[in-house]
């Protein structure tokens, strides 16, 4: 009774509809708790009946449904349930919540209904109640259209079909904007363990009908009219069938249900007549409410059986009245409330945490509560009588039973679990009641109510008691109570329910309202998109349910129902509950999911069945029923609920990635991170242990401190094979650190890094923890013989005179060498020594200077020494063993092996030496670079000495060539400069008289017809009738362009176009090439001025002209080289006497020797010619000269 009073107080607080939402949360929690206690008494049942008006439902329907958002009816519902469910006081929280919801509808009708609302805590806005009152006429008319459309169908529905229809209606209501009504329905009225099972059954069948008529809003009626919807039938058909079988009144209950449903449907479809009839049959809402209230005070005390007959009477009244009362909110609300109260007394608390305790019907009831369409009517229209009696009957009795089943489904869902937990206490009494009819009716009634317009969490909170108290009904109601079906978007089923006849009409007539910001939306997609801004549920209902479960862990927990219902108000203030939005991830839109059978009865509902694993086994019966679950948020735990949702999303989005590098964190020796010294994080060295500040150091001053080693910045034991990965700490003395097996993941030893004086001046006092040691790692200088060098004492400077110089004097310049004439003569000598005329390859200028030193400056004596093959030096001579570069002799076999090794291993002289074997690596290197220097073929640019680009290439090939050359113009210019720089700067050698080249007659002088084209390649002479044929033939010769001239026979002078030329130059210079085909347009022709070749692009001709310049340059260089070679040969012949004669070069003939730089122009041909000349003169060993095959080694791009 105290609880009832609290509920009454809550109801009174919520009596003002404005306060209804804020206070209902508190009231719901308290009411739920008290309802469990009072529900046993049974007085709570009467109170719920008394409240005829539900702010969320039209007054007619709301009267039938006791769904006060606040705690108005909670007290009465709870009282009745407490009376009946004394054993289920703890788990009866859910039942009480349901009862409270039904009572709230009764409470809405009158302040006397405040007691029922107390038992029934559900949050709703006053506006919703006002709307429900205002909707009495308008909504009834709206419902008329629905009733007219679906009247026949509703009449055709049997008791089982009625249950299914109720469930369908609840599902439709979930999908429709009246989701709040469904939620209210889902909030099964707390039914005390029915003292008399038959009375409960009688009441139950009556209640389902009036509950359906009164409890269901237009969407609910529509659902009822659509009994054919399979998903709505799920477990309800069986429960309805079972209702008559289970009790002595089961047959009557189904009949009454069918009749009552038909009446309700008729009344709903024919609101005016029904209202009149309701007015005739009904007792004024206030009277009915007062009666339930009066009954409730007495009923809470009397046993549930006494309350049940009263409730049966009230239900009978309401059964007759509710049929017409669908549009008459107050009478219907009163009857429905009374019937629901009676049902609650008759029906044991069906809300159990245990999934087994919850029958599928109960789970369906919960599913029906989320009806989105009902929410708008629930709020806007005066269908409260209808929704309220329907809610009371179906919600109280059926909702309890359905909660048993739904709670099974919800058991998987945390929200459902919370409801089940609260209903779990009531649930056992229901099972104990064992009234099949009542359970079936409860299932049927709960089917509709379990499609709560309010969030399932909120509805179940009211009925569920302490657990759902956490999920304050206000929290649910704010979601559900709003005229819009936003609360239902929170429930997947309501959103998932087909909008067909119901959803569309509901959406059209009722706007979806955001439960958080109260904004209205015309359709669910808009609402879903808006809900994302608040953080919506996951797109898929299953995901939402899972999230809801995670968000509301207390709800899914089945153990919660067994404990006594926690006081709902303490969990959250009514304002907080009313303001608590549904926890919905932003990424998940709220959708009305079509009901579909699933192992998780509330799988669709986010709150009821987030996951099958969370559901109790008994909830599996509800799998068939599609349940719209709105995550029930324990308002205090809402943020935590959101976190689980995020974690689930993160887990699903998680991609397997390789584990990151594990670097052990630095020792956490400083609890205050701000106090830690500045600078990089340091680790203990694994090679040397830092100086340990231990007592043993103070006691043993002789103990030598270990050397200071700067601590590493990276952990030496970090994962991976590092330099110190296998190093163990070596102990130093008894106080040394124990050795640790350093595995890749072994953290750095817990050593405290102390710094008595840090750079920033902050001194940190370090206190070692258990197992830690203080280590002084302050930078210091290691002192000792091992770390400091021994510096000798300063000596007298006079000691320098006694030191003897250990170097050998090799060269000392004389003052006479400063003479310019003498310098010139020395330069000439060095130039000769750098030529091939002297042994050593002409590169041994060092030997020349040594010889000149020995000759005391006499150039002629030095030159004579140089010309000797084997200079004899005494063993005592300081340079007796001195090796001069280029002085080694290489045999023919060695040169061949060297060439082969060089071609195989390039400049890897170690492998070259292994192949040559007779020479050292140093000799191989010296031989290579010596001859590279002599031959001057190691240039960076490409050499084109004997390669002449084919002038007869096709225009496309020339274009390609042009592009390539255009890409490397700078390279060409650089190479040209290099060539010029390498060309001897000394004056050109005097022209050597050579045989004038015999110029062959022009091609046309050969008697060939002018229209024929002859190939001028050597040993060829093929004649072609067209230039294209000749060009094609020229490709056969490819890069084998051979120079027709004899070596050294071509003068340095530039050849004229008319003269014989190499390659195809003569062909191009012939008149035939200068003529063009008559078909060619002269404006698009670009002929070559040199050879007459015609091009169709100026770029092609420009590229072609480069070939002429290159050919000319190459020919000029060849001529110069040949002339120089001939000059050198003639000079050597003149300067050398007869074989074996020791003659010396006259001093006046030194000017004839070309300076060393002139050697740059030497090539293979010159070297070979010089080799032949020198062989004849027997001046130098030819072993130092390269053979023809050796010259290949020194060509190409090799660099010095």
Curated annotation (Swiss-Prot):
Kindly list the positions at which Phosphothreonine occurs in this protein: 767, 954
GO terms assigned for molecular function: DNA binding; nuclear progesterone receptor binding; transcription coactivator activity; transcription coactivator binding; transcription corepressor activity; zinc ion binding
> Predominant location of this chain?
nucleus
Annotated compartments: Nucleus
Q: Which residues carry this modification: N6-acetyllysine?
A: 633, 640
Is Amino-acid biosynthesis one of the keywords UniProt gives this record?
no
The UniProt entry's coiled-coil ranges are: none
- What SUPFAM superfamilies has UniProt attached to this entry? beta-beta-alpha zinc fingers, Homeodomain-like
Region annotation (Disordered) maps to: 192-223, 256-320, 333-354, 391-503, 529-577, 595-622, 650-670, 954-1009, 1036-1081
Q: Where is this chain compositionally biased, Basic and acidic residues type? A: 971-985
Per the record, where are the segments of Polar residues compositional bias?
407-420, 439-448, 464-473, 599-608
Q: Where is the composition biased (Pro residues)?
A: 553-573, 661-670
Q: Where is this region: Interaction with CREBBP?
A: 439-1200
Looking at the record, the residues that make up the SANT domain are: 885-936
Role of this protein = Binds DNA and activates transcription of CYP11A1. Interaction with CREBBP and EP300 results in a synergistic transcriptional activation of CYP11A1.
Q: What is this protein called?
A: Transcriptional-regulating factor 1
């Amino acid at each position: 009774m105290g609880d009832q009073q609290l509920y009454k107080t809550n109801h009174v607080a919520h009596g003002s509809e404005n306060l209804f939402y804020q206070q209902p949360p508190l009231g719901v929690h308290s009411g739920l708790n008290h309802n469990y206690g009072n529900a046993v008494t049974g007085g709570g049942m009467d109170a719920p009946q008394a409240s005829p008006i539900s702010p969320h439902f039209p007054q007619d329907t709301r009267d039938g449904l006791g769904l006060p958002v606040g705690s108005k009816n909670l007290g009465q519902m709870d009282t009745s349930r407490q009376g009946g469910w004394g054993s289920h006081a703890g788990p009866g929280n859910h039942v009480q919540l349901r009862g409270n919801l039904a009572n709230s509808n009764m409470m809405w009708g009158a302040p006397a209904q405040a007691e029922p609302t107390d038992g029934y805590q559900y949050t709703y806005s006053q506006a919703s109640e006002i709307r429900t009152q205002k909707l009495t006429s308008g909504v009834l008319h709206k419902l008329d259209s629905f009733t007219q459309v679906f009247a026949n169908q509703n009449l055709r529905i049997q008791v089982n079909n009625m249950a299914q229809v109720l469930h369908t209606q609840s599902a439709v209501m979930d999908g429709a904007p009246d989701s709040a009504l469904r939620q209210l329905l889902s909030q099964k009225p707390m039914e005390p363990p029915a003292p008399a099972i038959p009375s409960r059954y009688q009441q139950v069948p009556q209640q389902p009908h009036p509950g359906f008529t009164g409890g269901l809003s237009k969407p609910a009626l529509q659902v009822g009219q659509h009994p054919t919807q399979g998903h709505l039938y799920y477990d309800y058909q069986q429960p309805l069938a079972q209702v008559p079988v289970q009790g002595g009144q089961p047959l009557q209950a189904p009949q009454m249900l069918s009749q009552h449903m038909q009446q309700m449907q008729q009344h709903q479809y024919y609101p005016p007549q029904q209202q009149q009839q309701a007015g005739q049959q009904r007792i004024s809402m206030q009277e009915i409410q007062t009666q339930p209230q009066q009954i409730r005070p007495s009923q809470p005390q009397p046993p549930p059986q006494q309350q049940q007959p009263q409730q049966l009477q009230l239900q009978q009244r309401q059964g007759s009245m509710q049929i017409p009362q669908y549009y008459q909110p107050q009478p219907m609300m009163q009857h429905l409330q009374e019937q629901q109260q009676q049902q609650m007394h008759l029906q044991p608390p069906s809300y159990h945490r245990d999934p087994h305790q919850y029958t599928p019907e109960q789970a369906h009831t919960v599913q029906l509560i989320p009806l989105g369409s009902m929410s708008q009517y629930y709020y806007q229209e005066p269908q409260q009588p209808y929704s309220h009696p329907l809610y009371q009957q179906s919600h109280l009795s059926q909702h309890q039973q359905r909660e048993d089943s739904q709670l099974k489904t919800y058991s998987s869902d945390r929200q459902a679990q919370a409801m089940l937990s609260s209903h779990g206490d009531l649930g056992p009494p229901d099972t104990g009641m064992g009234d099949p009819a009542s359970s079936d009716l409860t299932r049927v009634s709960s089917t509709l109510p379990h499609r709560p317009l309010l969030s399932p969490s909120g509805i179940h909170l009211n009925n569920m008691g302490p657990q759902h108290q956490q999920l304050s009904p206000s929290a649910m109601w704010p979601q559900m109570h709003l005229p819009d079906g936003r609360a239902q978007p929170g429930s997947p089923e309501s959103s998932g329910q087909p909008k067909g006849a119901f959803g569309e009409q509901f959406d059209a007539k009722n706007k979806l309202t955001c439960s958080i910001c109260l904004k209205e939306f015309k359709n669910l997609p808009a609402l879903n998109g808006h809900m994302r801004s608040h953080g919506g549920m996951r797109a898929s209902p299953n995901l939402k349910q899972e999230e809801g479960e995670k968000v509301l862990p207390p709800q899914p927990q089945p153990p919660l129902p067994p404990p006594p219902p926690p006081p709902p108000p303490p969990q959250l203030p009514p304002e907080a509950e009313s303001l608590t939005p549904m926890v919905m991830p932003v990424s998940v839109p709220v959708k009305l999911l079509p009901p579909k059978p699933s192992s998780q009865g509330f799988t669709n509902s986010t709150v009821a069945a987030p996951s099958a694993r969370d559901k109790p086994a008994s909830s599996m019966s509800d799998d068939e029923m599609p349940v719209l679950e709105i995550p029930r948020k324990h308002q205090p735990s809402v943020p935590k609920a959101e976190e689980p949702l995020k974690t689930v999303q993160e887990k699903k989005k998680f991609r397997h990635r390789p584990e990151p590098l594990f670097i052990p964190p630095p020792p956490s020796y400083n609890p205050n991170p701000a106090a830690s010294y500045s600078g990089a994080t340091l680790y203990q060295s694994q090679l040397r242990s830092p100086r340990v500040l231990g007592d043993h150091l103070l006691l043993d001053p002789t103990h030598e401190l270990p050397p200071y080693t700067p601590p590493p910045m990276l952990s030496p034991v970090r994962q991976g094979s590092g330099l110190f990965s296998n190093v163990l700490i070596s102990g130093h003395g008894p106080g040394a650190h124990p050795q640790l097996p350093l595995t890749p993941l072994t953290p750095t030893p817990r050593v405290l890094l102390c710094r008595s004086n840090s750079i920033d001046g902050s001194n940190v006092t370090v206190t070692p923890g258990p197992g830690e040691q203080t280590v002084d790692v302050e930078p210091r200088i290691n002192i000792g013989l091992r770390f400091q060098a021994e510096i000798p004492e300063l000596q007298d400077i006079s000691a320098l005179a006694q030191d003897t110089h250990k170097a050998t004097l090799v060269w000392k310049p004389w003052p006479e060498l400063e003479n310019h004439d003498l310098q010139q003569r020395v330069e000439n000598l060095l130039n000769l020594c750098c030529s091939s005329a002297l042994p050593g390859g002409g590169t041994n200028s060092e030997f020349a200077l040594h010889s000149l030193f020995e000759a005391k400056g006499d150039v002629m004596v030095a030159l004579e020494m140089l010309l000797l093959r084997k200079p004899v030096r005494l063993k005592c001579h300081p340079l007796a063993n001195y090796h001069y570069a280029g002085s080694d002799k290489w045999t023919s076999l060695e040169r061949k092996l060297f060439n082969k090794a060089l071609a195989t291993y390039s400049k890897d002289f170690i492998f070259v030496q292994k192949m040559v074997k007779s020479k050292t690596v140093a000799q191989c290197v010296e031989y290579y670079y010596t001859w590279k220097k002599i031959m001057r073929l190691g240039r960076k640019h490409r050499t084109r000495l004997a390669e002449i680009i084919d002038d007869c290439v096709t225009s496309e090939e020339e274009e390609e060539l042009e592009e390539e050359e255009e890409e490397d113009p700078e390279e060409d210019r650089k190479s040209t400069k290099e060539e010029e720089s390498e060309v001897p700067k000394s004056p050109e050698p005097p022209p050597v008289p050579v045989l004038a080249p015999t110029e062959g007659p022009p091609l046309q002088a050969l008697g060939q017809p002018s229209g024929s084209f002859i190939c001028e390649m050597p040993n060829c002479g093929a004649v072609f009738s067209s230039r294209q044929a000749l060009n094609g033939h020229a490709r056969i010769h490819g890069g084998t362009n051979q120079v027709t001239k004899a070596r050294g026979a071509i003068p340095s002078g530039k050849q004229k176009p008319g003269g014989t030329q190499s390659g195809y130059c003569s062909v191009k210079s012939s008149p035939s090439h200068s003529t063009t085909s008559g078909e060619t347009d002269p404006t698009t022709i670009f002929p070559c001025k040199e050879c007459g070749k015609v091009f169709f692009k100026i770029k092609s001709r420009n590229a072609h002209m480069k070939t002429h310049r290159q050919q000319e340059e190459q020919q000029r260089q060849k001529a110069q080289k040949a002339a120089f070679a001939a000059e050198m040969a003639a000079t050597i012949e003149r300067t050398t006497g007869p074989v074996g004669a020791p003659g010396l070069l006259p001093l006046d003939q030194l000017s004839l020797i070309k300076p060393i730089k002139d050697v740059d122009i030497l090539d293979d041909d010159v070297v070979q010619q010089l080799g032949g000349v020198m062989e004849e003169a027997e001046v130098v060993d030819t072993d130092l000269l390269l053979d023809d095959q050796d010259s290949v080694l020194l060509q190409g791009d090799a660099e010095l």
